[in-house]
Amino acid sequence: MSDLTSPKVNKSDADWREQLTPEQYHILREHGTERPFTGPYWNSTEKGLYRCAACDEPLFLSDTKFDAGCGWPSYFEPVKPGAVTEHRDSTHGMVRTEIRCANCGGHLGHVFPDGPPPTGLRYCINGHSMVFEPV
């Protein structure tokens, strides 16, 4: 895990608050979580690219999206190596692996080792942390 990785985009808290919606700010900057089955994209089957809502960096392709039944958009791999960073998360009485945008450090969600082939991983992502670009 890369807890010491510094994001490339650095903005003030005031700049983030001005740019992001309240939901996006809570998730991306305060490490919040949307309730399952309430955020955008959890049941979307459109083809396209999911980008970071904070910095527009490419994160996930629809070709890697699958229905995990958890209520959040789930993917088996990021769009490219290095698109996201992993961080130890020991909040809420459990240990998980948090996923952040490598470009701006925004909180995206968590990754779990219960996904489908070929990776066996499930990137469980808050829909409000992303914007969708159809192809």
From Swiss-Prot:
Enzyme Commission code: 1.8.4.12
Stored NCBIfam families: peptide-methionine (R)-S-oxide reductase MsrB
GO MF entries: peptide-methionine (R)-S-oxide reductase activity; zinc ion binding
Protein name as catalogued: Peptide methionine sulfoxide reductase MsrB
SUPFAM superfamilies: Mss4-like
Domain (MsrB): residue spans on this chain: 13-135
Family as reported in the entry's similarity comment: Belongs to the MsrB Met sulfoxide reductase family.
EC class name: oxidoreductase
GO BP terms: protein repair; response to oxidative stress
Residue intervals passing through the bilayer: none
Residues bound to Zn(2+): C52, C55, C101, C104
Species of origin: Agrobacterium fabrum (strain C58 / ATCC 33970) (Agrobacterium tumefaciens (strain C58))
Active site (record annotation): C124 (nucleophile)
Keywords, alphabetical: Metal-binding, Oxidoreductase, Zinc
InterPro entries cross-referenced by the UniProt entry: Met_Sox_Rdtase_MsrB, Met_Sox_Rdtase_MsrB_dom, Mss4-like_sf
